[in-house]
Amino acid sequence: MNALGTPQMVRQHRRTPPARASLLLLLAVTLVCGGANGGQGLPLDQITLPPGFEIAIYASNVPNARSMVLSPNGTLFVGTRTAGDVYAIVDRDHDHKADEVITLASGLNMPNGVAFRDGALYVAEVNRILRYDNIEAHLKDPPEPVVLNESFPRDRHHGWKFIRFGPDGLLYVPVGAPCNVCEGEDERYASITRMKPDGTRLEIFARGVRNTVGFDWDPKTHELWFTDNGRDRLGDDVPPDELNHAPKQGLHFGFPYCHGKKISDPEFGKKRKCEEFIPPAIELGPHVAALGMRFYTGKMFPGEYRNQIFIAEHGSWNRSAPIGYRVTLVRLEHHRPLKYEVFAEGWLQGSRAWGRPVDLLVHARWRHARVG
């Protein structure tokens, strides 16, 4: 299996006045088939999108690309899982194509999560959070990182982390369950935690979260929404993955006792009932591996997409008929899910996949003379 990565961009294909700012959707995809010269020559014509949209390669040769964060200056930072690397991707002339991919760090322990604040890059390993200060001035010679917190469990099963700063200025750090389904001894297992930017005052924000690898805040209410991956080995069609809504601290979302809205776990469900927990805001496809998610806050896409939720579905690994390998859209009305639909698909062809979406973000800095 080839673990190359290609950040790809989706944009509306229309004529745009010269020098008009546009906001595009940037998508991290891990390649599963060999060859393709690190992303060149990929069969992008197999990707189906709504009318008026197009997809293109933003950067090639980003092995094992996973989570992404964009600095205010436009540098794209990308974490990895198995590769152990962290990259900086630079587009100096803002022509929608990367000019250079720089390896900032190597040999890290599943550095999946990346976040950016006040000129510093934050990186999440399995058991610790690192900070690289003034990073954009030292892309070719990054400083030794500051270790902010190294108290997290060392389990690699669901140990890789997605991190982001919330509107409250705190860094949100999930801790996945160290198993398919179990009751963890450490209360931080199957939770979302948060801390101050200096690594202090770590606290649990939400419980009963099996393995979230993507979250975002509603741009209007500033409330947290997150994806969660359902347990395995209950069958092809159960349980669903979830999109959850956490308007406040202290909520429990069911794992390991309850899955989806009302599926009692055959092993742990006798201990607690589904009625005790917060149900998902909407159930997603079973085993689609819903990872990154973002509210679309741009203005380039038609108005119907503004403040709606895009989800990167990585794709199933043990389902009889593969599912996922796509980007889906959850349409909201009055901040409540109304519809769950496919936005982009084609990375899965029959029973074989050549790409697996991981994360997405809105790129606000690109300027161009014309699209179309």
Feature locations, PLM:
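Intrinsic disorder/low-complexity segments, especially N-terminal tails and targeting/processing regions
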Residues: Q12, L31-G34
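Bacterial N-terminal signal peptides
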Residues: S22-V32
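General helical structural elements
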Residues: R15-A19, L24, L70, D198
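Beta-propeller domains with acidic blade repeats across secreted/periplasmic ectodomains
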Residues: G34-G372
